[in-house]
Amino acid sequence: MSENSTVKKNVRVRYAPSPTGFLHIGNAQSALFNYLFARHYHGTMVLRIEDTDVKRNVPHGEDSQIDNLHWLGIDWDEGPDKPNPKYAPYHQTERQDLYHRYITQLLDQGLAYKDYATEDELTTMRDQQRAAGEAPHYDGRWYGRSVADQQAAEARGLKPSIRLHLPANHEYAWDDIIKGHVAFNSDNMGGDFIIEKSNGMPTYNFAVVIDDYLMDITDVLRGDDHIANTPKQIAVYEALGLKHPNFGHITLIYNPKTRKKLSKRDKETLQFISQYKNQGYLSEAIFNFIAFLGWSPEGEDELFSREELIERYDPARMSKSPAYFDQSKLDWINAAYIKRLDLDDMTDRVLELVDEGQTDVARQVKALQLPDLRTLTSQVCKIYQTEIHQLSEIMDKVLFYVTILQEPLDYDQLRQFDRTATLAVLTAFRKHVQALPVDVATPDFKKMIQTVSQETGVTGRNLYFPLNVAFTGDHSAPQIDEVLRLFANSTIIELLTKAIAHV
């Protein structure tokens, strides 16, 4: 690590998404590590919107990014919603005059030049280079061309792009916060590169330099797919006579099956934070999980609050190796956080998912319009809190129990047990339920099960498994006496009658 990267005074970092869609887990990883870095060093986190690629921007893409960052618990100190007059605006499309000012400076100094090459000419150039066994690169054909040549191109209706001229055999190097020393030679960077497109819009590698400089960004943490961009950005800094910030390149997230970078084509893995939210993953669990995708603390503990992660964060423990997305680990972490929830909090979170109606099961539960939905949801949460990995499973259970008389239960499981004992248990239990006074709102089902056991002489699995099948369709159901509280007595009697008919 460089000496500069260990000096952490007045730290300013930025997360700079493009409003091109939902918050991807890879982008969330970058946002999270910038957040931890800023908070650990008591610095400033900036949210900047890189929206110059207008064709790729989607309606409400920015709002979606911001909403999901808030849901994760990632906040910032400056941004479109928290402008600092010294650094605003925070949308690149609103900063065009700033970029053009520096473009003009480079043109005036002869460090950049206009390129009128057409796309067809550039394609032919690259094809010829490949045919000659060369790596495609810009050959500098418009560097040093006369004003007359430029005027002739203008007369043909051509609009120039602007390229930064790279000195030959020049090293662009930095001491990466994560990767260590990294160096590129200018001869292997594809030639002079475009810093302003022919439509007048700056390229990413130019605009980001101007923004980071003017916003006093001290440390740039981003995915290691940006490593090839960094020497180009350093070239811009050097051309302008500016000091570049510290760079740190975070390992990307990989699919453990293919051993390749996680791709949006990997349908087996949820890609977007909103999908995890809608499935009932807790924000604190997702935060905890992502923090381990590229970093690890000292010790063996794996469950940490945001505050603990901020305290323990150390960039020296960032990994250089790929981070593999372990779905089973995420499910384990989420289950652990669900177990910690207060019952009312858990109920609130499930009902919020129902109200938002972003999944089929949420919409189905919402459509039931149950007047006692909160009570029912709370009861189901109490029964299954230690059994589930996602809050969506609670919605599944609520829907199942409300519609259980229409559900095709697996009565074949009843044949695994002694037929005589099963009939005795189910029949005796039905008799006791039928005998309940109408005004008994909450029967003591645990005591009733004990009474049936005493009357029939049936105990253990031969007692409980048939009851589990009758009321859940699964012989391994938890807390059957609590499950029974979900039903009206008439429903219990009907379920017992159906089960008896299948013995």
Swiss-Prot record:
Pfam families: Anticodon_2 (PF19269), tRNA-synt_1c (PF00749). It catalyses: tRNA(Glu) + L-glutamate + ATP = L-glutamyl-tRNA(Glu) + AMP + diphosphate. A motif ('HIGH' region) lies at residues 17-27. A motif ('KMSKS' region) lies at residues 261-265. ATP binds at K264. GO terms for biological process: glutamyl-tRNA aminoacylation. One of its GO terms (cellular component) is cytosol. One of its GO terms (molecular function) is glutamate-tRNA ligase activity. Signal peptide: none annotated. Its EC number is 6.1.1.17. InterPro entries: aa-tRNA-synth_I_cd-bd, aa-tRNA-synth_I_codon-bd_sub2, aa-tRNA-synth_I_CS, aa_tRNA-synth_I_cd-bd_sf, Glu-tRNA-ligase_bac/mito, Glu/Gln-tRNA-synth, Glu/Gln-tRNA-synth_Ib_cat-dom, GluQ/Sye. It is an enzyme of class 6 (ligase). It is found in: Cytoplasm. Gene3D superfamilies: 1.10.10.350, HUPs. Keywords: Aminoacyl-tRNA synthetase, ATP-binding, Cytoplasm, Ligase, Nucleotide-binding, Protein biosynthesis. Its main location: cytoplasm. It comes from the Bacteria. PANTHER family: GLUTAMATE--TRNA LIGASE, GLUTAMATE--TRNA LIGASE, MITOCHONDRIAL-RELATED. Catalyzes the attachment of glutamate to tRNA(Glu) in a two-step reaction: glutamate is first activated by ATP to form Glu-AMP and then transferred to the acceptor end of tRNA(Glu). Belongs to the class-I aminoacyl-tRNA synthetase family. Glutamate--tRNA ligase type 1 subfamily. Monomer. This is Glutamate--tRNA ligase 1. It comes from Levilactobacillus brevis (strain ATCC 367 / BCRC 12310 / CIP 105137 / JCM 1170 / LMG 11437 / NCIMB 947 / NCTC 947) (Lactobacillus brevis). The gene is gltX1.
